[in-house]
């Protein structure tokens, strides 16, 4: 299947994943209140750290490996089973950690059943093998499965979560929506994997340990400046501030997910091109990908800054007004994470230069931790937002500098300059509308509509390659 079709399918998957919390959060936040939302998020973050350890970088490492050998049925069978068994063994260790935390940490003992329920994420992640379907580029199945599971989860949420005491139901549905579909992944593997096409005694689980460990090191460092702010807010301040911060993070991640949808599709393709030494095609694809990232992330970042009050009130309610500044402070990470994610986890990783990504993220993690220590005690969730934005900026800058020898980003190409021009224009437009109408519903609606029209018009005027391709695609569809 082509990259365009895979991108559209994955974009549908990502958008449905973003739509689910955007629909549910306004409903649940008004019922469970900031302290209830904050407690679940606090526990989910801790479980997320454990899941990160038990996964050991497998979700990314395995995609690259499956993409390389997907045409070799025997080797594909063997590697898939080896990675599944390795992940399962590590998950058992993860549950030992869960038991230790339950018996020793007072903040977790506040609600042991809730924490135990959320730990189901570990089991479903181990059996899911999502990496296999990404490696063979079966994004059609991934998208359909996700839509079905999320729809059922949405229905269940409105049926079972009606009072503040329904926190347990909310947590269960959250787990179902996130990883419940992995059960289908596991049983569907029989369609692709012949479990009798190799000798079990020939399996070598540990050959995957070291390369996956490299990705784990990278993931754990990334997780530090992605999740540490939430954990530090919970321990240093309180769950209410975690709830405020979580509201801004959820909307920011939702917007960021739109930009990152392309990256999931491109990792197996980059890996295949690099493995076959098709470097000219590799560079051309990388150039297009970076330009797409810049062209989409810039207007989304600007829109997030101007529309933060409306978005917070719309999706979270007036009780979450303290989330507005945090969301605006964090808006630059849309651009920073989009660039570093594509450059590091797709381009450089496919080239085998993951050490550059590790060095960059170490610097960002250290900066994030130090800034959190200084800023959170005095500024709470605003300080956490500042720390995260600065850390992501440093990661991106260091990665660009260290990776320049292997791939250089042409920030001032004709195509990218068009995006800067168009973004500057919509900033002026939004400032004018804000002065004319004030910060209200009319500004929100007109601001979005007029910004989209003006931005696309400028790109069309400058003959942007993506807009021209979209126009051609639409014309072909209409005339068929």
Regions found by a protein language model. Name each.
Residues 112, 122-144, 332-363:
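Membrane-interface junctions at transmembrane-helix termini in multi-pass inner-membrane proteins
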Residues 26, 55-71, 248, 252-290, ...:
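Helix-loop junctions and terminal segments of transmembrane helices
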Residues 3, 167-174, 183-226, 265, ...:
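Interhelical loop/hinge segments that connect adjacent transmembrane helices in multipass membrane
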Residues 2-60, 95, 102, 154, ...:
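Signature of the first transmembrane helix
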Residues 431-480:
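Membrane-proximal transmembrane or re-entrant/amphipathic helices at the cytosolic face
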Residues 1-22, 74-77, 202-218, 323, ...:
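N-terminal membrane topogenesis motif
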Residues 102-118, 304-335:
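Interfacial segments at transmembrane-helix termini and the short loops linking adjacent helices
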């Amino acid at each position: 299947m082509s990259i365009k079709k895979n991108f559209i399918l994955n974009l549908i998957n990502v958008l449905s994943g973003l739509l689910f919390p955007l629909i549910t959060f306004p409903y649940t936040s008004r019922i469970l209140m900031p302290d209830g939302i904050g407690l679940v998020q606090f526990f989910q973050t801790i479980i997320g750290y454990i899941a990160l350890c038990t996964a050991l970088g497998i979700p990314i490492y395995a995609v690259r490996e499956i993409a390389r050998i997907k045409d070799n049925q025997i080797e594909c069978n063997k590697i898939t089973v080896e990675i599944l068994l390795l992940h399962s063994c590590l998950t058992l260790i993860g549950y030992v950690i869960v038991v230790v935390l339950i018996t020793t940490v007072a903040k977790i003992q506040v609600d042991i059943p809730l924490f135990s329920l959320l730990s189901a994420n570990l089991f479903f992640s181990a059996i899911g093998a999502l990496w296999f379907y990404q490696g063979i580029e079966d994004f059609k199945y991934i998208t359909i499965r996700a839509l079905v599971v999320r729809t059922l989860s949405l229905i269940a949420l409105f049926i079972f979560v009606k009072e503040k005491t329904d926190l347990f139901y909310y947590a269960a549905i959250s787990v179902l929506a996130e990883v419940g579909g992995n059960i289908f992944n596991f049983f569907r593997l029989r369609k692709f994997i012949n479990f009798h096409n190799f000798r079990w005694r020939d399996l070598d689980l540990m050959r995957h340990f070291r390369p996956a460990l490299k990705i784990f090191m990278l993931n754990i460092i990334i997780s530090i400046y992605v999740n540490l702010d939430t954990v530090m807010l919970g321990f240093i301040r309180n769950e209410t501030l975690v709830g405020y911060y979580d509201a801004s993070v959820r909307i920011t991640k939702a917007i960021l997910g739109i930009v990152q949808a392309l990256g999931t599709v491109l990792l197996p393709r980059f890996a295949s091109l690099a493995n076959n030494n098709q470097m000219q095609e590799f560079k051309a694809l990388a150039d297009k990908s970076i330009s797409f990232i810049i062209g989409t992330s810039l207007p989304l970042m600007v829109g997030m800054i101007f529309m933060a009050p409306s978005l917070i009130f719309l999706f979270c309610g007036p009780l979450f007004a303290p989330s507005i500044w945090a969301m605006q402070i964090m808006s630059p990470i849309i651009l920073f994470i989009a660039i570093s994610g594509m450059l590091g986890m797709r381009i450089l990783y496919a080239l085998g230069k993951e050490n550059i990504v590790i060095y960059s993220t170490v610097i960002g993690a250290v900066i994030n931790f130090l800034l959190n220590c200084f800023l959170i005690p005095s500024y709470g969730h605003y300080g956490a937002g500042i720390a995260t934005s600065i850390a992501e900026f440093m990661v991106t800058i260091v990665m660009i500098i260290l990776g320049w020898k292997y791939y250089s980003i042409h920030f001032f190409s004709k195509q990218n300059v068009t995006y800067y021009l168009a973004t500057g224009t919509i900033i002026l437009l939004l400032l004018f509308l804000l002065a004319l109408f004030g910060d209200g519903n009319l500004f929100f609606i007109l601001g979005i509509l007029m910004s989209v029209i003006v931005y696309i018009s400028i790109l069309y005027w400058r003959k942007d390659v993506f807009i021209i391709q979209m126009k051609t695609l639409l014309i072909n569809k209409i005339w068929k």
